[in-house]
Amino acid sequence: MPEEIKRAARSATASRTTHETDITITVTLDGSGTSSVNSGVLFLDHMLTNFCKHSGFDLELECRGDLDVDDHHSVEDIALVLGSTIAEALGNKRGIGRYGWAIIPMDEALAQCALDLGGRSYCVFNAKFNRPVIQGFSTEMVEHFFISLAGTLKANIHLSILEGENTHHKIEALFKAFAYAMKAAVAITGTEIPSTKGQI
């Protein structure tokens, strides 16, 4: 890692408070994969803990949401705040790899993620799930989580399930593929902003 970039701590904290949720997130990109996640949605906690372990990000997340309604607002708003926090930690993106991709197996499931941190928000999601809910987490919210995150991260994210039957395995493989793709994309590989525009 170039010394002048290495010295700058790539960390950020962001909050969001509405009538539906109260969220605070701190992200450190060059971390050790440690996490303290309390989303109020147990399965989402499990997925975000896995994301940190495999991306190397450190994450502190606290969310109080209207789970008496359902999990939609909490999951959506966590994704929005997480995306904006990572974007802030990236700063001007000087020296980053920008692109990342991974294909990750989990037993019978096989997930693929390719992404670009180039400042353009877009999400393509190809996955179907057999179970509607896992531990309070609506599986339809997996796609919405990544769409919301792509919006505030200003990232182009493509996620697909290539094989699989078990819903837990498929979702976990998607989060792990996203983790490894992000690990590559945020890695410092040079000293320049990786765009012919001169900014991203």
UniProtKB/Swiss-Prot annotation:
Q: Which residues cross the membrane?
A: none
Which Pfam families does the entry mention? IGPD
The protein's UniProt keywords, in alphabetical order, are: Amino-acid biosynthesis, Cytoplasm, Histidine biosynthesis, Lyase
Tree of life domain: Bacteria
Q: Does the keyword S-adenosyl-L-methionine apply?
A: no
* Catalytic activity, EC: 4.2.1.19
Molecular function (GO) terms listed?
A: imidazoleglycerol-phosphate dehydratase activity
Tell me the GO BP annotations in alphabetical order: L-histidine biosynthetic process
Name where it mostly resides. cytoplasm
Quote the pathway field: Amino-acid biosynthesis; L-histidine biosynthesis; L-histidine from 5-phospho-alpha-D-ribose 1-diphosphate: step 6/9
Instruction: Tell where it localizes.
Output: Cytoplasm
Catalytic activity reported: D-erythro-1-(imidazol-4-yl)glycerol 3-phosphate = 3-(imidazol-4-yl)-2-oxopropyl phosphate + H2O
Example GO CC term: the record gives: cytoplasm
**EC class of this enzyme?**
lyase
Task: Spell out the family assignment given in the record's similarity comment.
Answer: Belongs to the imidazoleglycerol-phosphate dehydratase family.
HAMAP family with a match to the protein in the record: HisB
Task: Write down what this protein is called.
Answer: Imidazoleglycerol-phosphate dehydratase
Q: Which organism is it from?
A: Pelodictyon phaeoclathratiforme (strain DSM 5477 / BU-1)
Q: Which gene encodes it?
A: hisB
